[in-house]
Regions:
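Active-site-proximal helix-loop-helix substrate-binding element of RNase H-like nuclease domains
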Residues: 32-39, 43-147
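Entry/capping segment at the start of metal-dependent catalytic domains
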Residues: 1-32
Length: 147
């Protein structure tokens, strides 16, 4: 079975964020906006896309979600966006956040930054932190590429 690893980056600010709202309230809010999405198919290269909601839907529909295992860190978030905003439902889902919590409990931490450090997978950048309060239109091409 093919795997599709996915990671959405979305708009947030000091008052509108996952630390202030439930996942559902955040994703269903009128302020919600996808900045971009990264998808990696099986062993291939990661593809990063940023565009309008319609163009993002077209990009996402280019993958065979119905016959693939979708992998995400905090899959509840990414799969809810995939389903509620783009009407895409993968055949199977794997959540690396749940896996890491089951394996490491609180010893390592569940953040991507902590897990990357623990498994020597390189450093997670601070692009997401620097995106506070920025809409997709606020990014230049270079900033989006670094995201």
């Amino acid at each position: 079975m093919k795997t599709l690893t996915i990671d959405f980056e979305t708009y947030y600010d000091k008052q509108y964020s996952l630390s202030k709202l439930t996942t559902e309230a955040y994703i269903r809010d009128d302020q919600f906006e996808v900045i971009g999405v990264a998808v990696k198919q099986s062993g291939g290269e990661t593809q990063w896309f940023s565009g309008t909601k319609q163009k993002t839907k077209e990009f996402l529909n280019s993958f065979d979600w119905g016959n693939s295992l979708a992998i995400a860190h905090n899959a509840m978030f990414d799969m809810a966006i995939l389903s509620w905003h783009f009407d895409i439902k993968p055949k199977m889902i794997a959540d690396t956040l749940s896996m890491s919590r089951a394996i490491h409990s609180v010893e390592v931490g569940g953040s991507l930054k902590a897990l990357c450090s623990y498994y020597h997978l390189g450093a997670k950048g601070d692009e997401v932190i620097n995106a506070l309060g920025k809409r997709r239109i606020d990014f230049d091409d270079d900033s989006l590429a670094r995201y």
